Amino acid sequence: MKIKVLHMNRDLFEINMAVLEKRSHFIAEKIRKIEIDGTIMSENAQNGMEILCINDRGRKWCLNSSWNPIAASEFFAKRYSIRLYGVYFVFGFSDGRYIRELLKKCDDTNLLVVCEPNLKIFAKACSQFDLQDLLQEDRIIFYFPELEDKEGAFLQEIIDYTRIKLLEFCILPAYDILYHEECERYMDAVLECMRNATVNKETHFAFDRLLPQHMLWHMKHMIFYSNIQQVKESVLKKDIKDVPAIIVSAGPSLDKNIYLLKKAHGKAFIIAVDASARTTLMAGVRPDLLCSVDPNSPDRFFTGLDLDDIYWAGNNWTNPEILKKYAKHIFYYGYYGNTWNEVLQKELQYPFPNVAPGGSVSTEAFMLALMLGFRTIVLIGQDLAFTGGVSHTKGIGDALGDNDEYIKSRQIIEVEGIDGEILQTDYQMWFYKQWFEKAIRFYKDEVRVIDATEGGARIEGAELCTLEEVIQKECTKEMDMYALEEEVPPMFSEACQKKMLKKLKSMRTDITDFEKMIANAIQEQQKILTEIQKEPQDTARTAIALQNLMDDNKKIESNAMLSYISMYAQKEEYALGDSIYADENLTPVQLVEKSLALLKGYQKGAKLFLEDFDQIIMNDKDPINN
């Protein structure tokens, strides 16, 4: 078989790039800049078709069959039973033939998320093969880890609980060996998003209507405050290479070393989580940022504390009552639905800042420190275990009730402590421990993580150090972070604030329009249900009716208001995920009945959303800037 170094077919390459450009200018430009080298070759298979090969580890690896690449691709696709609404996470792109054959088995309800770990392979495939059909295919999402700095955030947009039973991995031949670590990272990221989706389900059920109400309040409130991106821009003007960020969490070991933290003030960026506020402030430490994201963060965390000069970080879930009562300076970030985030981006001329969720206020604080540009992050009070049989720092007091009763109520797991001893933790803290370990692995080239908790569970990948040693070795450069924060203005001028408030209120029309769309869809689908229940059934007419139903539902799914209204219809959406998406044996009548149940959930949700919108957004008597 003839082997040759692959040279660029510039005309074909540019044809493919022109198609890709329409989907992502950023990706197309990055691929155009890739330099061709001799590590990737082309080889003629036995049937004369060209395939890609790569030199790695002292040998040649074929990325498709050296006998018959089409037959091999067809055989690969036959392994997978494609289900309605299935989402397939494919690892590897090769020459595109495997993807093309897999796509042939899919319908309009399916999605392929194709991860190519080596951009050079993709670039050379674009120069060697006509990939226009794949590059413009809406059912394919291309994912390149080399270009994505927020892997979890990207995947979280794709994975939701309703389809959690319909997710499947498809790994191309040779890729699991050539890119074993990258493959594991991809799979771990997907699995973590699935866990997050399950946790989010329980969270939404627990808080129900509270979360969208919080979000609406913040959508209005933020107009008069600053955002965390503004802080980042101010920080980047300074040389912070030798300045660490210290995350102060509320574990029991915080009581051991909090008295030392005052020595780090002005030489580190100190982020305290809300539950650690009392212990931190009582030790004479004024944190540079107080992070609060719990929808039910209790007032007892803050009662009697002097918080007038404290800067807060808040997102769409933060308890508004706490901010109303205690916060005078707020830096916002988070996700406020597609519509409002797009309005913010258009006005600000940059994407509204957000971080990948981790499930706790400590993980949020970690991601904020990373986002702000700090490359040494120190953890204190991050026990992630019941150290000494205690759940939290003494500063919390009775905020969580009796300590022993609280621990007894938890699902207990055993973990290794920093000194090798076995400690008790609960499932929730174990989950956060896993999150930190994954984050440390993922960002290993960007950040150094030091665990100066001096107790608690061992966090794999974090350096162990005492807080005294951290202060001596890492906190050596003076930097007035408070003065830097004081210089950050509100994100909008006074005139722009009025304009943004007007834009926010204009969303009311979108809500009422959505209500009308849902009412019409329900009416039409009730007609369909009546029609297909008639005997004898007309198979052709039933197929047309079901197609019309799917078309109606697609229009509803693409409506921007759905991201808000679905927050009020969580039970209906999750019930749909547990039945219609997972049960392939539903009759046409059952399909329509399930669809109607969901639409009626949306109809109810739209009514509730409009009630909250009028009470929170349209209510001019409610003071905002307090």
Identify what each model region corresponds to:
Residues E321-L384:
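Active-site/ligand-binding-proximal alpha/beta "capping" segment
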